[in-house]
Amino acid sequence: TFSGCKNEPSSEQKNDKIVYSNIVSEKVQNDLMKILTDSSITTERQNVLFDHIKQFNSIVNSKNLVSDFEEYDAKKTKYDPYDMQDEWNQKSPNFMGYNCRITAFGIYRDFLEIPQNSDVNNEMILFDLSALSEDSSVLLKKNDENAFSIFYSVVPTTLTKDIDTHVATLQESWKNRGIKFAKNKKASLISVMFHESIDENDNYLFVGHTGILFESDKKLYFLEKIAFQEPYQLTRFNNRSELNDYLMKKYDVSYDQPTVSPFIMENDQLLQEYKRITD
C-alpha cells in the first residue's frame, strides 16, 4: 500500500543520508525561485507554490522543519509525522492541505497536454479532489480539474511482475488518451507508479507518489510534497541513481506480493537509472 500522497503519515526509509531542505529560509526560497524560473515555470505558478509552502510552514512548528540544506538520515525525519498531522488538524480542521499530486500538477501543468475527452476513474484520488474542492488555487487553466482527474486516473493492467509490460501498458494508455509531455530541458515529472491488484482480473496502475526533478548548476533537485500533512521538501542529488535509491528505499517496502514493485517514470519513460534496491 502506498503512503506518499495519502492522508496518512509516510513510511520510513532505511539508513541513508540525504541533503534536503523544507524550504523555510529565505535563501533556499530564493534558490528555488531561480531554479523554477530557469526551468520556465511561470511566475503565476511559482506564486501559488510559495503561498502553499509558506502556509504549511507557518502552521507547523518550525523547530521540526529543516530550514537550509542540511544532511540528515533519511530514516529519521526531524518531525514526528503523527504529531505534525495533529498540529495541522488543530490549526486547519476543515482543510487537509495539498499532497504530492496536487503540488506536482500545479507546478508542471503547462508542460502536460491532456485532452478533455478521456474516461475518468477517480478511485485513487478522492482525497485529492476533496482538497481541490476546498482550495482550487493550483487549477489555473479552464478544465484543469478534469485534466487532473484524467491524468491521475488509474490505468488497467495485468497481474504480472514484469516491469516492461507495465511500462508499455502505461505508455499505451497515455498515448491512447492523447496525453503528451512537452519538452523542458531543465525539468521533468517524476512519477512513482504502484500496482494494485484486487484479484487476477482486476489490476491497475496509479501514481503513488510524484514530484518535479530540476537540473541546476550540475546538480539535481527533487521537489515534492511528502504527504497532505507533511512538509514540502527540496532534496539535492548528484545523479539520477541517487534519486532512484531515495525513492525506492522509501516506497519499495512490500515483499512476496503478486504485484510488480514500484517503478519510476521520468515523464513518459522509465527512469534510465531505475533499479530495485536489494540490500
List the model feature ranges, each with a label.
Residues 31, 38-39, 45-197, 204-208, ...:
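Acidic/His-rich structured neighborhood in mature extracellular/periplasmic domains
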Residues 35, 107, 246, 250:
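Residues that form generic nucleotide/phosphate-binding pockets
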Residues 229-232, 237:
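Extended, aromatic/histidine-rich regions of cofactor-dependent oxidoreductases associated
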Residues 2-4:
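C-terminal motif of bacterial Sec signal peptides marking the signal peptidase cleavage site
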Residues 11, 199-201:
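Intrinsically disordered, low-complexity coil segments
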Residues 6-8:
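Bacterial signal peptide processing site
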Residues 10-38:
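N-terminal low-complexity, Pro/Thr/Ser-rich intrinsically disordered segments
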